[in-house]
Swiss-Prot record:
Belongs to the RbfA family. One of several proteins that assist in the late maturation steps of the functional core of the 30S ribosomal subunit. Associates with free 30S ribosomal subunits (but not with 30S subunits that are part of 70S ribosomes or polysomes). Required for efficient processing of 16S rRNA. May interact with the 5'-terminal helix region of 16S rRNA. It comes from Bordetella parapertussis (strain 12822 / ATCC BAA-587 / NCTC 13253). Monomer. Binds 30S ribosomal subunits, but not 50S ribosomal subunits or 70S ribosomes. It is found in: Cytoplasm. The gene is rbfA. This is Ribosome-binding factor A. GO terms for biological process: maturation of SSU-rRNA. One of its GO terms (molecular function) is ribosomal small subunit binding. GO terms for cellular component: cytosol. It comes from the Bacteria.
Amino acid sequence: MRRHKSKSIPGRNLRLADQIQKDLAGIIQREIDMTRAGLITLSGVELSADYAHAKVYFTVLGAEPDTAAALLNEKAGWLHSQLYKLLHIHTVPTLRFVHDLQITRGIEMSVLIDRANRPGPHSGVPDEPEDQS
């Protein structure tokens, strides 16, 4: 039985995604005026198999996610050229910025869990007895 060797180096995708995230965070912090877009944190990078495209996930505080996404995607071409100068690879991926909803959903789930665990008249959990001193 013949085995086909993978042409990609194991873990390369993850290492490259981490490096892109690190470099982009530095470029955005140093070079782009993000006062309109609030405080932006890059939370992850997802690369296509051929490294031609990258989804860059971000979270934002102090501004609307759509405003931040529009500003980042407007600067994507310039950010691509800056990455090209830093990364020593043949193909630097085209960048697309996407608001990361995982943190927002996590907070919503935490609130729902706290609400469900809160003692109340319909929860089946008795309220704290009142002190009758």
